[in-house]
């Protein structure tokens, strides 16, 4: 499975926790996850994710528009293949599958990292893994769903850092 992350920055080249080396490593982690867990249809040989960095004001606007929640958040995901019930339902016969968009606010990620006693890089990897899991149908509205999602994202973060 080949995973490609297309990166964009709405902040005009502001400082970022993210770098090209991280992109390659997270693509591998996501590819490994897909190979092991098989969440995509058999026909899918590659997948694509759009990753965009937004400033706090931009993220607050997006959060308000789509979640009706005030203020910025660390990560938002917009799944391409979510059906009306919220389940992941991609086309079964596509060999290349765009999964959707992940929008990250590095400033909020850095604040959360400091509050949680983590490195900014570790927190960035965590929110991107979290966003990816939303793209393939995971949610955390219920405790059981939350536990399953958190276990997977923590496993992916550990793989990223070689733990």
Where do the model's predicted regions map?
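An acidic/histidine-cluster motif and surrounding catalytic segment
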Residues: 1-125, 133-163
